[in-house]
């Protein structure tokens, strides 16, 4: 059993490149291919990605359009992002553009409401 623990320790210390090289050497030595298990793992990964999408916890707030009250929207973007005046103006003029990324659902809804109250059209994705 001590030999297995040593092997695990040795394998854990390999870099990614060394692990890939080891995989190729074992394929050659044993006459097998790792292609089939990789395809199965990729299919399983796709199913896992679908589950993750349903349980989305991070959202992006997108400024779709500045609207008629562009100055108020620029002020609100500055308050939300902490950007300077020029950067906030550039962001507003480049709409559609992400104002805030990777925020929780409540914060995203709050930011969207603030932008809409300032006269902009915003979206949460």
UniProtKB/Swiss-Prot annotation:
GO terms for cellular component: cytosolic large ribosomal subunit. One of its GO terms (molecular function) is structural constituent of ribosome. It comes from the Bacteria. The keyword tRNA processing does not apply. The keyword Ribonucleoprotein applies. It holds the Pfam family Ribosomal_L12_N. Keywords: Ribonucleoprotein, Ribosomal protein. GO terms for biological process: translation. InterPro entries: Ribosomal_bL12, Ribosomal_bL12_C, Ribosomal_bL12_C/ClpS-like, Ribosomal_bL12_oligo, Ribosomal_bL12_oligo_N_sf. Homodimer. Part of the ribosomal stalk of the 50S ribosomal subunit. Forms a multimeric L10(L12)X complex, where L10 forms an elongated spine to which 2 to 4 L12 dimers bind in a sequential fashion. Binds GTP-bound translation factors. PANTHER family: 39S RIBOSOMAL PROTEIN L12 (PTHR45987), LARGE RIBOSOMAL SUBUNIT PROTEIN BL12M (PTHR45987:SF4). Forms part of the ribosomal stalk which helps the ribosome interact with GTP-bound translation factors. Is thus essential for accurate translation. Belongs to the bacterial ribosomal protein bL12 family. This is Large ribosomal subunit protein bL12. It comes from Rhizobium johnstonii (strain DSM 114642 / LMG 32736 / 3841) (Rhizobium leguminosarum bv. viciae).
